[in-house]
Swiss-Prot record:
Signal sequence, renumbered to the chain: none
PROSITE patterns, alphabetized: RIBOSOMAL_L20
Keyword field: Ribonucleoprotein, Ribosomal protein, RNA-binding, rRNA-binding
Role played: Binds directly to 23S ribosomal RNA and is necessary for the in vitro assembly process of the 50S ribosomal subunit. It is not involved in the protein synthesizing functions of that subunit.
Protein's name according to its UniProt entry: Large ribosomal subunit protein bL20
Length: 121
């Protein structure tokens, strides 16, 4: 069999990794081995944090809902329980958006939850 020389293939592979490492500090953007190690780590972090981002947004929505609910004299837990008992199916993303942008609508939902829990509107 003929001997396979890797000159062109290796050069293309190195170029691809160094392109991904553009903007990194020091040797991590200039030399292949440190750049390759950092690119592998960076891609792993990106993969993990794309999944973590879902939970981060959920936490943000809950914090916003809780803050708006407490301004109306009820906490997050009771609000969600009251809405569930009232049969109001609204997700946390929409509820948080209402708390920020449509306070009148959010206040109406709080009143519905309070009625269902018997806390008085």
């Amino acid at each position: 069999m003929a001997r396979v020389k890797r000159g062109v293939t290796k050069h293309q592979r190195h170029k691809k990794i160094l392109k991904l490492a553009k903007g990194y500090f020091g040797a991590k953007s200039k030399l292949f081995r440190p750049a390759n190690e950092q690119v592998i780590k960076s891609l792993a972090y990106a993969y993990a944090h794309r999944r973590q981002r879902k939970g981060d947004f959920r936490k943000l929505w809950i914090a916003r809902i809780n803050a708006a609910a407490r301004m109306n004299g009820i906490n997050y837990s009771r609000l969600v329980n009251g809405l569930k008992k009232a049969g109001v199916e609204i997700n946390r993303k929409m509820l948080a958006d209402m708390a920020v942008n449509d306070q009148a609508g959010f206040n109406r939902l709080v009143d519905i939850a309070k009625e269902k829990l018997g806390l008085g509107a």
